[in-house]
Amino acid sequence: MKASVHPDYQTVKVTCSCGEVFETRSTLCKDLNIEVCSMCHPFYTGKQKLVDTGGRVQKFRDRYNMRTGQAKSKE
């Protein structure tokens, strides 16, 4: 195996925009700034918003049912 093929694996400090700071290991030699972490991401905090696709689904179902209904009445 070749010596010194892999870069150094160092501890870096990660800072989130919400203020959370934690340490991890990386081949980067500088500290990281991130926008979202597990402390502020809506999925992990339980504050996620559900997108209302019911209107689009209902519109599709109405259009599909109308076409199938017309095909049956022509027979």
Swiss-Prot record:
Source taxon at top rank: Bacteria
Q: Alphabetically list the UniProt keywords.
A: Metal-binding, Ribonucleoprotein, Ribosomal protein, RNA-binding, rRNA-binding, Zinc
Cofactor(s) the protein needs:
Zn(2+)
Pfam families the UniProt entry points to: Ribosomal_L31
The protein's GO terms of the molecular function aspect are: metal ion binding; rRNA binding; structural constituent of ribosome
Q: Which GO terms describe its biological process?
A: translation
Annotated family: Belongs to the bacterial ribosomal protein bL31 family. Type A subfamily.
Q: How is the cofactor bound?
A: Binds 1 zinc ion per subunit.
Q: Is Ribosomal protein among this UniProt entry's keywords?
A: yes
| Protein's recorded name | Large ribosomal subunit protein bL31
Q: Mind telling me which InterPro entries this protein's record contains?
A: Ribosomal_bL28/bL31-like_sf, Ribosomal_bL31, Ribosomal_bL31_A, Ribosomal_bL31_sf
State what this protein does.
Binds the 23S rRNA.
Question: GO cellular-component terms in the record?
Answer: ribonucleoprotein complex; ribosome
Q: How does it assemble?
A: Part of the 50S ribosomal subunit.
The residues the record assigns to binding Zn(2+) are: C16, C18, C37, C40
Q: HAMAP family annotated for this entry? A: Ribosomal_bL31_1 (MF_00501)
Keyword Transmembrane helix present in the record's keywords: the answer is no
